[in-house]
């Protein structure tokens, strides 16, 4: 490739600047003489540091080209696999495929949580920018922002009807929103530190929250009163989730344990300790997963009649563990993420586990065979949260890169 005279002059000035600013005086004066460069302070300023800038931008572009090439190859592979095969594949086995259907921008800080609405074709994201945003996942349209918290929104949860949304924040409050009028109808105070997790109980009458103050609290939806406090964790409680019928709640903590509590008595039924670092996330197994879990493990529950309940946990030790709550046994450990695990979920069909982590990936696990069957490079930064739609073929992820991505499953 031949350079024009102007490009040649620019390159010569940039080389001269590089030689001079790095102390190669002899080479600089020789080069200046041979390249016939005149003394021009204005031009010298213009080309200061230009060679280094060009060099680093070339490296950046090369990296981008390589990324795009690998995405292109992945997409080609998907087309050859995804076409006719997807018609034959059972929807229970559909998994997210690259590239993402939508990458949605709007948050001004890391996204902390993403969830689907149980009825409408919308999803909701929470962020460190203190806002909650509502998006249409079918069109990718932004719908509205809910404002009210004064610090990072840490978690959000719908009731089963989708009429109420609960949110919690580092501002130490829990808010309840009417999801039809989008008004905040109640604010609950009582925790002494950052409220890291919230969930509306299956009966819709109570909310459970977890905090950096080491406690979990249960609140009455109708009055906003705190009716129960669960204590036992020795450190920050990261996440709390009720089981399907609301009789048990699971919590995980910086104390490296997962605990299961009986709601009625506030008693800690099980303390699960095998993780070697902070436990970031937990998820209950749906009944659709029980047959595969029993196949995959010689679970004690087989002998005792009714299986389970089973629980997943993800940790900063980079592993995912599956637990039989009735025995307190760890049934399996899945290893493959290269950084902290931030989200764990069972596929609605029950055969797979879906996880996200600070290694920027979304992974799908065939847990019966204890193998990672697909890895998607999901975001430019840590992936903080994921949700799998219960009925429609979509997965949503949120990231420190401030985006929300919608992935189609097939």
Swiss-Prot record:
Can self-associate. Component of the cytosolic PAF-AH (I) heterotetrameric enzyme, which is composed of PAFAH1B1 (beta), PAFAH1B2 (alpha2) and PAFAH1B3 (alpha1) subunits. The catalytic activity of the enzyme resides in the alpha1 (PAFAH1B3) and alpha2 (PAFAH1B2) subunits, whereas the beta subunit (PAFAH1B1) has regulatory activity. Trimer formation is not essential for the catalytic activity. Interacts with dynein, dynactin, nde1 and ndel1. The keyword Metal-binding does not apply. Dimerization mediated by the LisH domain may be required to activate dynein. Keywords: Cell cycle, Cell division, Coiled coil, Cytoplasm, Cytoskeleton, Developmental protein, Differentiation, Microtubule, Mitosis, Neurogenesis, Repeat, Transport, WD repeat. GO terms for cellular component: 1-alkyl-2-acetylglycerophosphocholine esterase complex; centrosome; cytoplasm; microtubule; microtubule associated complex. Belongs to the WD repeat LIS1/nudF family. It comes from Tetraodon nigroviridis (Spotted green pufferfish). One of its GO terms (biological process) is cell differentiation. It is found in: Cytoplasm, Cytoskeleton; Cytoplasm, Cytoskeleton, Microtubule organizing center, Centrosome. The keyword Repeat applies. Residues 7-39 form the LisH domain. It comes from the Eukaryota. WD repeats lie at residues 106-147, 148-189, 190-229, 232-271, 274-333, 336-375, 378-410. GO terms for molecular function: dynein complex binding; protein heterodimerization activity. This is Lissencephaly-1 homolog. Residues 32-82 form a coiled coil. Regulatory subunit (beta subunit) of the cytosolic type I platelet-activating factor (PAF) acetylhydrolase (PAF-AH (I)), an enzyme that catalyzes the hydrolyze of the acetyl group at the sn-2 position of PAF and its analogs and participates in the PAF inactivation. Positively regulates the activity of the minus-end directed microtubule motor protein dynein. May enhance dynein-mediated microtubule sliding by targeting dynein to the microtubule plus end.
């Amino acid at each position: 490739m031949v350079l024009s005279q102007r490009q040649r002059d620019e390159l010569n000035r940039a080389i001269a600047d590089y030689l001079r600013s790095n102390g190669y005086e002899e080479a600089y004066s020789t080069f200046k003489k041979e390249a016939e460069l005149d003394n021009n302070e204005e031009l010298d300023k213009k080309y200061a540091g230009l060679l280094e800038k060009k060099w680093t931008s070339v490296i950046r572009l090369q990296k981008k080209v390589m990324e795009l090439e690998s995405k292109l190859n992945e997409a080609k592979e998907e087309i050859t696999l995804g076409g006719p095969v997807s018609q034959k594949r059972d929807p229970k086995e559909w998994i997210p495929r690259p590239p993402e259907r939508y990458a949605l921008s709007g948050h001004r800080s890391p996204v902390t949580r993403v969830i689907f609405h149980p009825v409408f074709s919308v999803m909701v994201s929470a962020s460190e920018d203190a806002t909650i945003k509502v998006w249409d996942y079918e069109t990718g349209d932004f719908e509205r922002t809910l404002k009210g918290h004064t610090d990072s929104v840490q978690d959000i949860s719908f009731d089963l009807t989708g009429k109420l949304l609960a949110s919690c924040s580092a501002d130490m409050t829990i808010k309840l929103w009417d999801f039809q009028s989008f008004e905040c109808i109640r604010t609950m105070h009582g925790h002494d530190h950052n409220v890291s997790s919230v969930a509306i109980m299956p009966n819709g009458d109570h909310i459970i929250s977890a905090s950096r103050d080491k406690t979990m609290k249960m609140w009455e939806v109708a009055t906003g009163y705190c009716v129960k406090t669960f204590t036992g964790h020795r450190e920050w409680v990261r996440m709390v989730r009720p089981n399907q019928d609301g009789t048990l709640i699971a919590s995980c903590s910086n104390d490296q344990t997962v605990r299961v509590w009986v709601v009625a008595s506030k008693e800690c039924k099980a303390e699960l300790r095998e993780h070697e670092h902070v436990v970031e996330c937990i998820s209950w197994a749906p009944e659709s997963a029980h047959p595969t879990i029993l196949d995959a493990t010689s679970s004690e529950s087989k002998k005792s009649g009714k299986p389970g309940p089973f629980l997943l946990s993800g940790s900063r030790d980079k592993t995912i563990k599956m637990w039989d709550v009735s025995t307190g046994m760890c049934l399996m450990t899945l290893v493959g993420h290269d950084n902290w695990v931030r989200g764990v979920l069972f596929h609605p069909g029950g055969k797979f586990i879906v996880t996200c982590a600070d290694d920027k990936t979304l992974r799908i696990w065939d847990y019966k065979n204890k193998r990672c069957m697909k890895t998607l490079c999901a975001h430019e930064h840590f992936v903080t949260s994921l949700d799998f739609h219960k009925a429609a073929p979509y997965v949503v992820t949120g990231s420190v890169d401030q985006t929300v991505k919608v992935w189609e499953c097939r």
